[in-house]
Amino acid sequence: MKILVLNSGSSSIKFKFFDNKIVKASGLVEKIGEQNSKVVLKNTLNNESFERELTINNHEEGLSIVNELFKESGILADLNALDGCGHRIVHGGRNLSEHCLVDDYVLKEIDRVSIFAPLHNPAHLAGIKTMIKAAPSVANAAIFDTAFHRTMPDFAYMYALPYDFYDKHNIRRYGFHGTSHAYVSSRAAKFLQKDQNELNVISAHLGNGASVCAIEKGKSMDTSMGFTPLEGLIMGTRCGDLDPAILPFVSHLKGLTIEEIDTLMNKKSGVYGICGYNDFRDIEREIEQGNDKARLALDMFCYRLVKYIGSYFAVLPKTDAIIFTGGIGENDSLVRQKVCERLAHLGIELDFELNKQRISGERMINHANSKLKVLVIPTDEELEIARITEELIGKN
């Protein structure tokens, strides 16, 4: 099948084109709504690039340029030649708990739950509507970050607030990075040559946004992110877990509005709030130069991660493997080392040489004597979205 995967942001569209699960093109529309907008399409088979720089006023104009570049490159005759288009949607809310093909109800529901993800869902919606207009005959699939976590039990996803908050306002833990956690856990099963229904893993997706997931027999049992992607781990610029009583205290202390507090927690906190850097390469360079705040930020990040992974040992009946993925998880050997050393009493023994090797691809980095497997699995959310889209189209 010919599948286009779209990840529409407020001012950008990232895309990948798959033909029978092989990536043939990828690209980006950036700075939508600005005068210096840019569209780049790369033929991934021969690395040839096609670019346009012009003013793009909206997503519809951006996708029309993508269509022109597909024709120019000879990769795809027209968007109408696609079998389907898979759209990454951050939040499905309570009603859209599973991936699905798009219809009028789905469009309305994505719009309705935009209040839960105001920076993401409206842009995703614009991407879907643009695709429907550009290629009316092509099936569109909504692939939700939240869907993988639909298997969490109620005692794991409920907050200890008055029940009406859940019943009437859908306030509960939803979890995110679901497409990534689903992909790497299935890849881990293949790597270990085990049936996914026999495997229990703890997946750590570590990037500027970060989350951990306890996966029992291929199903999410718990995850660190909650009602929004702010809960859980310390992240690049997000604070993660904190005492909620801090918020009204800070509001009175600093005279901050609700919106300003939201910005503080999402964009000015995390490791960035501690040391002024959110790129771990910068943080580790600063540590080498004696920056104590950088060292503190890294220690805090790893400690919170260890606490979550450790707690998921208690959640799962047994744990077979820990998976590191995402930009930090795949590339930062120091973070992996610090985390695994603190978990040694649980039977994890890292092979330091394997851990330090800077090689791409799926690999095992535990010592032969380790009771648990420690895996590095590069995530591929676009491939997972393409796979699910094909599956949904096949069912219909």
From Swiss-Prot:
The keyword Lyase does not apply. It is an enzyme of class 2 (transferase). GO terms for cellular component: cytoplasm. Disulfide bonds: none annotated. Keywords: ATP-binding, Cytoplasm, Kinase, Magnesium, Metal-binding, Nucleotide-binding, Transferase. It is found in: Cytoplasm. Pathway: Metabolic intermediate biosynthesis; acetyl-CoA biosynthesis; acetyl-CoA from acetate: step 1/2. The record marks 177, 238 as: Transition state stabilizer. Pfam families: Acetate_kinase. The keyword Transcription regulation does not apply. It catalyses: acetate + ATP = acetyl phosphate + ADP. ATP binds at residues 14, 205-209, 279-281, 327-331. It comes from the Bacteria. Homodimer. Catalyzes the formation of acetyl phosphate from acetate and ATP. Can also catalyze the reverse reaction. Belongs to the acetokinase family. NCBIfam families: ackA. This is Acetate kinase. It comes from Campylobacter jejuni (strain RM1221).
